[in-house]
């Protein structure tokens, strides 16, 4: 059974990208997959300080917040879903913070299948920019497959 982790970076509980996450979850659970949604706005996640403390501490960040729990879920997941609204022509600040905080483990994640959920109101070119942001992160994972590419 596949273990799916959805990272929802919408700051709005009933925002469009959050609704899409919930629909993805329903469909995956109907197929028998285990699904966890992490709503970043409901977690205490500090900004990366670029101190390299995690590199000196065997991959453990010096910040004591909810990110350690999320990274553990991230490592165990077979499938990763990154969901973001587009704000001011790019991924949400919450998604960027999440990506930055994966620094201690991003090179040691193993094989992942990755999906994106991006919601925007301004058109396809705006979504393309956000795809570039997410691709820049995912393409540096150890072993990945972006679904649909």
Question: PLM features: residue spans?
Answer:
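N-terminal beta1-alpha1-beta2 submodule of the flavodoxin-like/Rossmannoid cofactor-binding fold
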Residues: 1-83, 89-100, 104, 139-146
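Short glycine-rich anion-binding loops that position phosphate/pyrophosphate groups of nucleotides
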Residues: 86-88, 121-122
